[in-house]
């Protein structure tokens, strides 16, 4: 990985070169001596054998060589003095070399040790640097991975922002379309109210003819029912009185019977206690007699067991012996009879204890029977109170009937005028055309609220007015039923969509989100995170549809909150105002064709809506669906 550091040349290397040069010089000297001398001296051979190192042999040979050579020269052949001088100078140098060599060796060892330590330090530093570099590389890799993840998340967030912007644009377009449809639905509502007012006017005339016969039949039927109820109540009262008398007699008899039984049991208890006391006394007396008899028996046995005196006593007569035997037999029989008597008395005591326990267990049952006998009296009191309340109600009914007769006689003169005025006012919305309703909405005065006439002229007018109110109530109930059906249909659709979004990962979840096909332009990869995001969008739309609906209703209503001429009265539309979370919007013919092609209409939740549209063709040719369901339906781009 890293380049090795180049160290400067150490002085030990120069020393090695010197040693190599010295060795070469020694070799040359040896060769020179071998050439000049015919034979090697014996001292040199011995020194070579004893000293193992080459340096010592060389020094010894170099030191003694001048003398030996001189002797050899003088003995064998004469040599020149110049050569001897030349040889003495290198010998002196060779003698100085061993001392300097040992010093250099020690220095070299020290330098080697220091170099080894430096090498270890350098290796340690290199390892630490390698570890630090590895850690830095790991940190750099982790940072690169995190940067990649952040880039991926950034891309996902950008795609989500793009989809949310598109969905917001889509909902803005939908809101505009829904505002237009709300205006159309309000117009249609005004037309339907006009038709209803015309229908009510025609039905009133029919109801006026039938009210007289109906009212008479109702009053007669109510009177007959009241008479029957009175007869039944009287019969029930008589039966209850008789049953009360019987119950009271039974209760008195049972109380007397209980008193007699209590007295008998008390007498028996007293007798038993007296018998127990007498038995205890007899038992004590019998115990005393048994003890006396036992003492007498022990005395007799002792007398029989005593040894005869040395003097011959007087022999008892046979009559005395027989008398003693008879007494013993009599005492034994009396003891057996006493034991049997005691056993009988213990058995009797146990039986009496069991009877006492049974009587104690029966006492709470008898008390409960007494309480049950006392309950009919309470029920009789309650029935008397109910009968009194019924009589009071009958009196109140009679008084009310009398008051109604008087009011009918007094109101006969004023009813015709009010009915004619009401019929004229209610017939006004039906006379105008439906096309100019919106144009003349601000100029026409609001339709008056149909009020209940205070003074009624005849029973026919009363019946017509009541029938009119009943029809309005029926219509409000139908509206409520339709709203409930739409709510159920919407909830089931939303649950199906959310389940579909959560169960199917990938690109389908985005296609099934709010907006239908408008979200198909996104990324086609389709991860599970994107499916979960689309499901979350659907859930958020499902939870917040009420707020959006109220905003659209506020924008579609009149700014001054004044009803138009074809608008319903506030009293008639109270139920519709309470259910402000729902609103029916008519769709165009193109949307109707698409809805027919939609396979969701084959489901059981969508069938009631189609059936209502087929059963009521007069309500319009366009099918109606709550506006918050429109976002889930396939939408055609106009």
Curated annotation (Swiss-Prot):
InterPro entries: GM130_C, GOLGA_cons_dom, Golgin_A. Residues 561-574 have a biased composition (Low complexity). Pfam families: GM130_C, GOLGA2L5. Transmembrane segments: none annotated. Residues 514-525 have a biased composition (Gly residues). Residues 434-446 have a biased composition (Basic and acidic residues). One of its GO terms (cellular component) is cis-Golgi network. Residues 50-62 have a biased composition (Polar residues). Residues 1-11 have a biased composition (Pro residues). GO terms for biological process: Golgi organization. Keywords: Coiled coil. Residues 105-160, 223-275, 318-417 form a coiled coil. Residues 1-84, 427-453, 510-532, 556-575 are annotated as: Disordered. Belongs to the GOLGA8 family. This is Golgin subfamily A member 8S. It comes from Homo sapiens. The gene is GOLGA8S.
